[in-house]
């Protein structure tokens, strides 16, 4: 069944024989999407499952790595209103929409937002018990972060 995640309205659009139906995100606990081009499945879980750790989050976490230390990805939409000043004829007249991605570490002790800075992320992961040998090849990109978590979780 074709499904599209609506990040802005926090829900799922499902294509059925009768047309496209919208399911409110609050009614969905988790879902799995299979990407036909990559032959890979992605698991999404509602942020309310982690509400005891971070009550202010809303949306769906994409689970990038499962295990003792989970790597989660949360994509949200930010809207920047126009800041045009007529008197100065300066600023932007357009509303801008940004897609912001944040990464989180989840374990039995809590849910932690990973810092954007590589050095701060490495320091935080060391404090969570990651060995320094796993963190040597981490450059600060998601493509390097996922193998670090996968290696750590497979060794536990």
Could you tell me what each predicted segment is?
Residues 122-156:
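Long, compositionally biased interface segments
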């Amino acid at each position: 069944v074709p499904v599209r995640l609506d990040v802005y309205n926090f829900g799922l659009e499902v294509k059925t024989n009768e047309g496209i139906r919208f399911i409110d995100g609050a009614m969905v606990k988790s879902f799995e999407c299979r990407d036909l081009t990559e032959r890979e499945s992605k698991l999404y879980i509602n942020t309310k499952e982690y509400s005891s750790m971070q009550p202010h989050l809303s949306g769906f976490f994409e689970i990038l790595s499962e295990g003792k230390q989970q790597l989660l990805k949360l994509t949200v939409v930010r809207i920047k209103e126009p800041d045009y000043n007529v008197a100065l004829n300066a600023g932007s007249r357009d509303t801008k929409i940004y897609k912001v991605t944040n990464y989180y570490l989840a374990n039995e002790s809590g849910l932690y937002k990973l810092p954007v800075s590589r050095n701060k992320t490495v320091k935080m992961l060391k404090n969570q018990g990651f060995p320094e040998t796993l963190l040597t090849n981490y450059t600060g990109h998601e493509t390097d972060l996922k193998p670090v978590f996968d290696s750590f979780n497979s060794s536990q």
